[in-house]
Amino acid sequence: MNMFSAFNINASGMTAQRYRMDIISENVANAQSTRTDDGTPYRRKVVAFAEKGGNTAFATALNSAIGYKGMGFSGSGVKVTGVYKDYKTQMKMVYDPSHPDADEDGYVLYPNVDIITEMTNMIDASRAYEANATAFNASKSMVARALELGQS
């Protein structure tokens, strides 16, 4: 494991959380969008993450340190595997016969975006980003100190 692995791991976490915050912002912005380009209401989007592989030296050290015998950890950070539309959560039906998108019974189909859930997810993503940034700065301080020791 080289000294820049920690930077790469933390940077991947910050990038993933920033992307997650972008998608959450899009959900909040479209919470009242009853018609998209395809004529249907906006559907909430969710970001999926996966562990990056490849850092076997770190993984071996970590897994032996914790006594793990299974698959273990690769220790190379995180990556975004995709953005998926949420088809599990139902759309909201609201009676509003004056709305231009109302059906023949006067109901309007609204997006399946819950603002409270999205704001909670935004706080979670923000704190995860902040934790990665703090770890990044700690790694930077350790490398700077190691360089100072190497010069003495």
List each model region and its residues:
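Amphipathic alpha-helical polymerization modules
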Residues: 1-152
